[in-house]
Amino acid sequence: MSQSRTLRQKSQKYQENIEKRGVASPKKKEDGLNINPYVLGFIIFVVVGSTLLQILKGQ
């Protein structure tokens, strides 16, 4: 008994879906820091500011 054309197409579509299931697309990892520029600026501000205060208090 041969399958009808629509039944073959549905079967093939189902098989393709089964083969794709669970396959995650690879994501490219971005190079560089994963930190917000504002947070980085704040950290630099605190470090430089505290260094300047220490220098001024020492005089």
Curated annotation (Swiss-Prot):
Biased composition (Basic and acidic residues): 16-30
Coarse class of the protein's main subcellular location: membrane
Keyword Transmembrane appears in the UniProt entry: yes
Gene Ontology biological-process entries: endoplasmic reticulum unfolded protein response; protein transport
Annotated keywords: Endoplasmic reticulum, Membrane, Protein transport, Translocation, Transmembrane, Transmembrane helix, Transport
Top-level taxon of origin: Eukaryota
Extracellular side: 56-59
Transmembrane segments: 35-55
Span list, region Disordered: 1-30
Localisation per UniProt entry: Membrane; Endoplasmic reticulum membrane
GO cellular component terms attached to this protein's record: endoplasmic reticulum; endoplasmic reticulum membrane
Annotated membrane topology: Single-pass type IV membrane protein; Single-pass membrane protein
Stretches in topological domain Cytoplasmic: 1-34
UniProt cross-references to Pfam families, sorted A to Z: RAMP4
Protein role: May interact with target proteins during translocation into the lumen of the endoplasmic reticulum. May protect unfolded target proteins against degradation and facilitate correct glycosylation.
PANTHER family: GEO09675P1, STRESS ASSOCIATED ENDOPLASMIC RETICULUM PROTEIN SERP1/RAMP4
Family indicated by similarity: Belongs to the RAMP4 family.
Protein's name in the database: Probable stress-associated endoplasmic reticulum protein
Gene designation: serp
